[in-house]
């Protein structure tokens, strides 16, 4: 059975090369890849990541090669089924209860039980987690508790977690509820 990577993408746009580069490596190594987005919508590449004439303002130069632009356009094409039907994180992972809920303790017990079930029945089948960057993750991944739960679950299971560009901010905000410190604390 091939190893499987879970790739989380923003519904507000991902930087094309940050998906295409790892995906080419995963495909070449024979890995199976599953995609996930916050609500199960098909992710889309940010248009500058498909434009070889785009000049990155801080760098003052073009940052997208023609070959990469074509590869990003190919995977972003709605006719390409590869990114269709990503896993829906909202439907897959439980919502953490509000601290002010009158039934907070019981709701937290149920939340942890559901999270344990997802970890034991679903996440154990994955070998690694990748969070793709671009500006979109700032909108719908960085403060997304379900993304944090994925990160913490993979970490708890001793499985690799990788993030690119703005996707790294998800790691900074993934905190253990016990000590409230970021998993990046002290690193």
Report the location of each language-model feature.
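Extended, subdomain-level signal for the structured scaffold at the beginning of enzyme domains
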Residues: 1-157, 170-187
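Active-site cofactor/cluster-binding pocket
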Residues: 160
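Short, thiol/selenol-centered motifs that function as redox-active sites or metal-ligating centers
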Residues: 164-169
